[in-house]
UniProtKB/Swiss-Prot annotation:
This is Ribosomal large subunit pseudouridine synthase C. The keyword Ion transport does not apply. Keywords: Isomerase, RNA-binding, rRNA processing. The gene is rluC. It is an enzyme of class 5 (isomerase). Pfam families: PseudoU_synth_2, S4. GO terms for molecular function: 23S rRNA pseudouridine(955/2504/2580) synthase activity; pseudouridine synthase activity; RNA binding. The active site is at D149. The lineage of its organism: Bacteria, Pseudomonadati, Pseudomonadota, Gammaproteobacteria, Pasteurellales. Responsible for synthesis of pseudouridine from uracil at positions 955, 2504 and 2580 in 23S ribosomal RNA. Its EC number is 5.4.99.24. One of its GO terms (biological process) is enzyme-directed rRNA pseudouridine synthesis. Residues 25-82 form the S4 RNA-binding domain.
Length: 322
C-alpha cells in the first residue's frame, strides 16, 4: 500500500533488455533516465542493496551496460514533491519551443536563453533538459552533448539517441566542432591578443560556489579571439574556444584585463554599473555559431543563433555613443 505523500515511479518489477543504442552507458545513468524524478541517492541505494540486477547478478553503480543485457528494475516509490516550482516555469517551457533552431531524429539544436540552467540541480529544479522532456514526453533519450553556463545564452546541442551522443562527443574530443561566442568586454581589446593559452584550475569556496582561476597547476586551455566591433569603453569580441574548460572564456577575458559585462564571478563592478545604466542586466556572453558533422549522415552543418533583444539594444546604444 502506498504511503500518503508518496509517488510511485515504478509500480512493478520490470525486466528491460539493453538495445545497441543504449549500450555503453553506466547503469546509474541509465536508471536516472528510466526512473525520472528519483534522486541519485535512492538509485545508488537500490543498486547497492542488489534490488537492481543485470543478467540476474549484482552490479556496481559504475557498471557499463552491454547490448543484450537484461536489467531488473524494482518497484520504486519517492516522496511527493510540491509541483508549484514547475508550474511557475511553464511559460519558460513553452518559450523554449520557439528557441529550437533545428530538430531531427538524432538531435535538437536550441538557442538557450540566459538565466536557464542546462540541468536542474544545485537548488534548481528546472533546467533545459527537464523542459525538453516536458515538451517531448515521447522522447526515450534526451541528453546534453555539451554545456553552457546558466547565464550564457546561445547554441546548445541535445542528443536524442545514444549513438548520436557518442558520435558528437568524439567530434568534441578530436576538436572538429567549431564553436564561436560573442562577448562584450571592458575597454579596448588589444589587436595583438589573438590567442590566450592559460591553464585553468577549478576551486570550490567554503560557500560551495565554484570558481576558476589561472594556475600552472590547472588544465591546459586555449581560446582564440578576434575583434568584431569597438566602442568608446568596450569591445565586442568573437571568442572561439579550442578546449572546453569550465568558465574558460570568462576567465581568459579577465586574465587579458578585459572582463565580460555583467559577469558576477569575474567581472568589473564599475564597468557593470555603466552597462546596467544602458539597460543590460545579464551576462553578455552568447554562443552564436557552431559547425559540426551530422552524427548520422556526416553532412557538415552550421547554425547561427541571433542575439536577444536586450543584447542588440545595448550594442546599438554603444554605437550611437561613439
Amino acid at each position: 500500500m502506498t504511503k500518503q505523500n508518496e509517488k510511485i515511479i515504478n509500480s512493478s518489477v520490470k525486466m528491460l533488455t539493453i538495445s545497441e543504442d543504449e549500450s555503453g552507458q553506466r547503469i546509474d545513468n541509465y536508471l536516472l533516465a528510466k526512473l525520472k524524478g528519483v534522486p541519485k541517492s535512492l538509485i545508488y541505494r537500490i543498486v547497492r542493496k542488489g534490488e537492481v540486477r543485470v543478467n540476474k547478478g549484482r552490479i556496481k553503480p559504475e557498471y557499463k551496460l552491454q547490448t543484450g543485457d537484461v536489467v531488473r528494475i524494482p518497484p520504486v516509490r519517492v516522496a511527493e514533491k510540491n509541483d508549484a516550482p514547475i508550474s511557475k516555469n511553464l511559460n519558460k517551457v513553452a518559450a523554449l519551443e520557439n528557441q529550437i533552431l533545428f530538430e531531427d531524429d538524432c538531435l535538437i539544436i536550441l538557442n538557450k536563453p540566459s538565466g536557464i540552467a542546462v540541468h536542474g540541480g544545485s537548488g534548481l529544479n528546472f533546467g533545459v533538459i527537464e523542459a525538453l522532456r516536458a515538451l517531448r514526453p515521447e522522447a526515450r533519450f534526451l541528453e546534453l552533448v555539451h554545456r553552457l553556463d546558466r547565464d550564457t545564452s546561445g547554441i546548445l546541442l541535445i542528443a536524442k539517441k545514444r549513438s548520436a551522443l557518442r558520435n558528437l562527443h568524439e567530434q568534441l574530443r578530436v576538436k572538429t566542432v567549431q564553436k564561436d561566442y560573442l562577448a562584450l568586454v571592458r575597454g579596448q581589446w588589444q589587436s595583438h591578443i589573438k590567442v590566450i593559452q592559460a591553464s585553468l584550475l577549478k576551486n570550490e569556496l567554503s560557500s560551495g560556489e565554484r570558481i576558476v582561476r589561472v594556475s600552472e597547476q590547472g588544465k591546459p586551455s586555449e581560446t582564440r579571439f578576434s575583434i568584431e566591433e569597438r566602442y568608446i569603453n568596450a569591445t565586442l569580441v568573437k571568442a572561439s574556444p579550442v578546449t572546453g574548460r569550465t568558465h574558460q572564456i570568462r576567465v581568459h577575458t579577465q586574465y587579458a584585463g578585459h572582463p565580460i559585462a555583467l559577469d558576477d564571478k569575474y567581472g568589473d563592478k564599475d564597468f557593470d554599473k555603466q552597462m546596467n545604466e544602458l539597460g543590460l542586466n545579464r551576462l553578455f556572453l552568447h554562443a552564436f555559431s557552431i559547425r559540426f558533422e551530422h552524427p548520422k549522415n556526416g553532412e557538415t552543418l552550421r547554425f547561427n543563433a541571433s542575439l536577444d533583444h536586450q543584447m542588440k539594444a545595448i550594442l546599438q546604444k554603444l554605437r550611437e555613443s561613439k
